[in-house]
């Protein structure tokens, strides 16, 4: 099982402009691949739309499913559609240098979360693990993204 995540930072419009963070997570049964990455991006953009956000800034490591031609092509087509229709938010990928996870804002969140979900006395089922992760990050448990049969 794999997990895709976006750490969303919101700034309140109140007098103090306090930021708060939300984790948006989707689990995958199997390995992450480009087709799943594009589905996750589409889902993320759909969630951002009601908030009136105009861009999704992605801080990404160099995983192959982040850098693939399929993903880059999908992002380019998505951004073209946003520009042509004036609806939605563009995606701005910001690739990190190789072997530099400390530059990714979501990494400390993952590290702290991992320690809270493990069960020292037994292995957790995939569903139990996903539910615990969602409880720690206070996010809804969404249906798992499916790996298309042709790439499985």
Predicted feature locations:
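Electropositive, glycine- and tryptophan-enriched low-complexity nucleic-acid-binding patches
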Residues: 1-53
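Short, conserved catalytic/metal-binding motifs centered on acidic residues
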Residues: 5-6, 41, 60-61, 104-107, ...
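Conserved beta-strand termini and adjacent loop/short-helix elements that scaffold enzyme active sites
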Residues: 27-28, 94-98
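Aromatic-rich, lipid-facing transmembrane alpha helices and their immediate juxtamembrane interface loops
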Residues: 48-51, 73, 78, 93
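Acidic/histidine-rich, metal-coordinating catalytic segments
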Residues: 53-67, 96, 104
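A short helix-to-beta-strand connector/capping loop
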Residues: 54, 82-92
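Short, aromatic/basic amphipathic alpha-helical patches
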Residues: 68-84
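C-terminal anion-handling pockets and recognition modules
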Residues: 90-92, 99, 103-152
């Amino acid at each position: 099982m794999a997990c895709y995540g976006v750490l969303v930072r919101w700034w309140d419009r109140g007098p103090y402009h306090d930021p708060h963070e939300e984790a948006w997570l989707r689990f995958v049964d199997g390995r992450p691949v480009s087709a799943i990455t594009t589905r996750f991006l589409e889902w993320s953009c759909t969630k951002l739309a009601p908030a009136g956000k105009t861009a999704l800034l992605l801080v990404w490591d160099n995983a192959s499913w982040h850098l693939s031609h399929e993903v880059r092509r999908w992002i380019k087509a998505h951004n073209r559609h946003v520009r042509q229709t004036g609806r939605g938010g563009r995606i701005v990928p910001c690739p990190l240098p190789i072997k530099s996870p400390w530059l990714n804002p979501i990494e400390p969140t993952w590290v702290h979360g991992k320690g809270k979900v493990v069960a020292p006395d037994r292995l957790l089922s995939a569903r139990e693990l996903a539910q615990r992760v969602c409880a720690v990050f206070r996010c809804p448990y969404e249906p798992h993204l499916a790996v298309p049969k042709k790439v499985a």
